[in-house]
Design a protein with these regions (language model features):
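Small cysteine-rich, disulfide-bonded extracellular modules of the LU/uPAR three-finger superfamily
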Residues: 1-101, 105-146
């Protein structure tokens, strides 16, 4: 498959070098997934990505590490399940839901701008005592996402 005049093998190589997956001669990049909340009236994009929940940070919320598989047909996906902390309080409200995922180069919240943002198919809620698990292969990226 050629997309934008690029061969699939070249697309795969770009994805490996950008997201790194421990292939020979390629270091594994430390990448993390953050949860983005409702953005009324805003486009879902990097500039408006918001990890604050109902206007405040949560006491036990942390970004989760993600490791990508080797790209296939110009698409790269998470190779393992991604598990966030169990919520020690409600992470969402009736007006603030999880609508997107952001991929970051750091677990540190000083790194505010994600390298890519993915919209979820439907808004999700997380109540106290619940744990968000993202199944293997559910986070998929292609060059059109970056």
């Amino acid at each position: 498959m050629a997309k934008y005049g690029l061969q699939t093998s070249f697309l795969n190589e770009i994805l490996i070098r950008y997201f790194g997956n421990g292939s020979p001669n390629i270091d594994i990049n430390e990448l993390y997934v953050g949860l983005g909340t409702t953005q009324t009236g805003a486009d879902i994009n990097m500039e408006t990505f918001n990890e604050l929940f109902d206007g405040k940070p949560l006491c036990n919320y942390q970004r989760a590490r993600i490791i990508f598989n080797t790209p296939e047909n110009g698409v790269i996906s998470n190779g393992d399940e991604i598990c966030f902390n169990t919520a020690s309080e409600d992470w969402t409200t009736t007006t603030s839901k999880i609508e997107m995922l952001g991929i970051f180069r750091s677990a540190d919240f000083d790194d505010k701008e994600p390298i890519v943002v993915i919209s979820l198919p439907k808004p999700e809620t997380v109540s106290k005592g619940e744990t968000i698990l993202l199944a293997k292969g559910v986070v998929q990226l292609s060059l059109t996402d970056i």
